[in-house]
């Protein structure tokens, strides 16, 4: 046989990426990866490790013990070989903690949202989603094949109107409990009332509420609505619990249905045992050390005061609005140069004109660390502060 014929490529099918890259660069919207060292030298005000549990010795030991007993990987789908007693123990303990009847673990909070929304909807359904819902909820709506209505942020009247005018037999309202970009709270009580007026299911992403609101049990529990039969919670194990993975929590019938119907559960490898063991240990620490959620909120209030943010934080998130993405990038870089790492949110994560520094408070911040934050943030924001007002 002769050498294979070489077919010349007139134009690369990926040539369009060059133009897109230039557009992103010119708009200040390029992203990059920056590996962190095992032990950081900067003050961390960017991670979602709200309770400081990712480095807690009990949490690390929980992961190590699970690794020794069950091995490095789950070895398969939960429906084949990837299920362990550890998975089911954590599901039961998480559900009990937030006041739900049952729980189901997923490999991430992202896949938990995909599994819950897509698995509980489909053609002939209506999904009503807040405009600021997390990207995983947005993608779940897109994959659902349901009709989707996106309502203005925290607008209960718009939700009510969308539900009232529907023709679909089934309807679902979708919201974060704590919105990730600005830390505001969803009007859960009012949303649930609207759902009940129109026979709709309420799906709440408690990723930023678990471990912080309601003494750690989440915003729904704080409002006295835990265990409602027409509410499904999703959450992540990667924020307050300092591990990795996600969960859907709600009625037992929902768990049973998702085992049969949630594609991100059926066709994904089960959550690694070490992540399950670490999350289970973190939940134990959260139950035992009840000061941690209050400390997060107190530190968030202090950070907001430092940054002259007028609104009192309702979560671990403190949002410092700067507007221009280049200004936000420069401010974040200046903070890092001075020893403080902060988040920087730009479009498309947030709407155009609302680029911001996103600070996340942690329960374990010391007085010396708070003083460093005060000094650096005050210095850095002296310039950009005028631009954001």
Curated annotation (Swiss-Prot):
- Which InterPro entries does this chain map to? Aminotrans_II_pyridoxalP_BS (IPR001917), Aminotransferase_I/II_large (IPR004839), AON_synthase_class-II (IPR050087), PyrdxlP-dep_Trfase (IPR015424), PyrdxlP-dep_Trfase_major (IPR015421), PyrdxlP-dep_Trfase_small (IPR015422)
Question: Which Gene Ontology molecular function entries are recorded, alphabetically?
Answer: 8-amino-7-oxononanoate synthase activity; pyridoxal phosphate binding
The enzyme class is: transferase
> Which annotated residues bind pyridoxal 5'-phosphate?
109-110, 180, 205-208, 236-239
Reactions the enzyme catalyzes: 6-carboxyhexanoyl-[ACP] + L-alanine + H(+) = (8S)-8-amino-7-oxononanoate + holo-[ACP] + CO2
The Enzyme Commission number assigned here is 2.3.1.47
GO BP terms:
biotin biosynthetic process
Q: Write out the pathway annotation from the protein's UniProt entry.
A: Cofactor biosynthesis; biotin biosynthesis
Q: Which cofactor does it need?
A: pyridoxal 5'-phosphate
Pfam families per record:
Aminotran_1_2 (PF00155)
The parts of the chain that form a coiled coil are: none
Q: Which residues bind substrate?
A: 31, 134, 349
Disulfide bond entries: none
Write down which residues bear the modification named N6-(pyridoxal phosphate)lysine: 239
Which UniProt keywords are given for this protein, alphabetically ordered?
Answer: Acyltransferase, Biotin biosynthesis, Pyridoxal phosphate, Transferase
Subunit info? Answer: Homodimer.
Family label: Belongs to the class-II pyridoxal-phosphate-dependent aminotransferase family. BioF subfamily.
This chain's function reads:
Catalyzes the decarboxylative condensation of pimeloyl-[acyl-carrier protein] and L-alanine to produce 8-amino-7-oxononanoate (AON), [acyl-carrier protein], and carbon dioxide.
According to UniProt, the name of this protein is 8-amino-7-oxononanoate synthase
Question: Source species, please?
Answer: Mycobacterium marinum (strain ATCC BAA-535 / M)
């Amino acid at each position: 046989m002769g050498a294979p014929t070489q077919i010349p490529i007139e134009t690369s099918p990926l040539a369009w990426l060059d133009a897109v890259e230039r557009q992103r660069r010119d708009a200040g919207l390029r992203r990059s990866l920056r590996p962190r060292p095992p032990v950081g030298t900067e003050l961390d005000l960017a991670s979602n490790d709200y309770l400081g549990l990712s480095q807690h010795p009990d949490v690390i030991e929980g992961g190590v013990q699970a690794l020794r007993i069950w091995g490095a990987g789950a070895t398969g789908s939960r429906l084949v070989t990837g299920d362990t007693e550890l998975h089911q123990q954590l599901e039961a303990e998480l559900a009990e903690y937030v006041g739900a009847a049952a729980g189901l673990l997923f490999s991430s909070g992202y896949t938990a949202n995909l599994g819950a929304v897509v698995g509980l909807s489909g053609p002939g359904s209506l999904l009503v989603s807040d405009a600021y819902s997390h990207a995983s909820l947005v993608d779940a709506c897109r994959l659902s094949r349901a009709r989707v209505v996106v309502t203005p942020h925290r607008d209960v009247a718009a939700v009510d109107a969308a539900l009232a005018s529907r023709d679909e037999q089934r309807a679902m309202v979708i919201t974060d409990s704590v919105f990730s970009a600005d830390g505001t709270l969803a009007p859960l009580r009012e949303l649930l009332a609207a759902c009940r007026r129109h026979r709709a299911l309420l799906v709440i992403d408690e990723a930023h509420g678990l471990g912080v609101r309601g003494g750690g049990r989440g915003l729904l529990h704080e409002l006295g609505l835990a265990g409602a039969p027409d509410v499904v919670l999703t959450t992540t194990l990667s924020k307050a619990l300092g591990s990795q993975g996600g969960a859907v929590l709600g009625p037992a019938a929902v768990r049973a249905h998702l085992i049969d119907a949630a594609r991100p559960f059926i066709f994904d490898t089960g959550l690694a045992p070490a992540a399950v063991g670490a999350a289970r240990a973190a939940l134990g620490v959260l139950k035992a050390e009840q000061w941690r959620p209050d400390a997060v909120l107190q530190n968030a209030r202090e950070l907001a005061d430092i940054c002259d943010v007028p609104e009192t934080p309702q979560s671990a998130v403190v949002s410092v609005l700067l507007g221009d993405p280049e200004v936000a990038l420069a401010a974040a870089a200046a903070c890092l140069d001075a020893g403080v790492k902060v988040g920087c949110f730009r479009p498309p994560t947030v709407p155009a004109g609302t680029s911001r520094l996103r600070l996340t408070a942690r329960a374990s911040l010391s007085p010396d660390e708070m003083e460093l934050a005060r000094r650096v943030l005050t210095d850095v924001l002296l310039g950009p502060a005028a631009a954001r007002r």
